[in-house]
Amino acid sequence: MKLGFLTACMPERPLEEIAAWAGAHGFAALELAAWPSIGDRPFTAAHVAADAFDAAEADRVRGALDGNGLSLSALAYYDNNLHPDPAERDAYHAHLRACIDAAAALGGVPVGTFIGRDPGRSVSENLREAERVFPPLVDYAGERGVRLMVENCVMEGWHPDGYPGNLAYSPELWEWMFELGLWLNFDPSHLLWLGIDPLGALRPYVDKVVHAHAKDAEVFAEQRNRFGFFGRTSTRDQDPWDMGWWRYRIPGLGQVDFPRYVDALYEGGFDGVLSIEHEDPVWGGSPEKVEQGLEIAQRNLRPLLVG
């Protein structure tokens, strides 16, 4: 298993600089952010120009990685494939196909996305719509030797009341999406705050995991007693992502049992990339703090990996 990180935590830095830093600090892989330029939306970046991908861009990406002893674990473009606005949805699908094309040219690495949700429709209506939307995208990827994977992030900030905005947050929904030909980018942090045992959820499905995130979560029980499971209400409009009773952390600084998580991946036969997704507010806010957070994560995770 190799250790890498998702480059979205360094949105202002060019790929060449990120790759040089990663190689110099002992990382083995990068999961490259491949969003289009979408302003200051947090935890997105454009380190691969998927919408203008050509031979020169492929050479640039390969050169940055190869020159620093790094492999490419995946392309990351996580957006709402069930967006209620048809024009927005079409744009997301077009960019997702561009990411698939880029991934095919870069060796057939997986492409990460979300199911998403139309918040104005019921869950069952969204599932039926997804069953219409995703087969052409899965076929497009398969024809190019690329696996389309979905992260089990809740995306509660996409729903006005903090309900799940990405219908891939539980094992029940994973089984449904596997039937559509989708794969899983497993992240234990989301399950922890949902009250789902990450290890119990993972073990039956390791063979469907093509990429694994390393992100921790910290739950504050006393705050949950104040706000309830669904989080803040009267102040939600100030920050729809802040539920008030939990937060993401660097691996090892929250409550996920990472030794057992990595062991469960190994036991199930996973030998891919463990990719740190850095969204820790304590170790963020400046380039220096982000780097320090990644170094803490590496120190905590590297002893768990074989090779």
Where are these regions (language model features)?
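A short, acidic, amphipathic alpha-helical segment used as a generic capping/interface helix at domain edges
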Residues: 253-267
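Active-site groove signature of glycoside hydrolases
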Residues: 103-123, 149-159
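Active-site beta-loop-alpha junctions enriched in small/polar residues
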Residues: 6-10, 33-37, 77-80, 116-118, ...
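Conserved beta-strand positions in the central sheet of alpha/beta enzyme cores
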Residues: 31, 74-76, 112, 149, ...
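Conserved active-site loop/cleft motifs that coordinate metal ions or position small ligands
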Residues: 30, 268-279
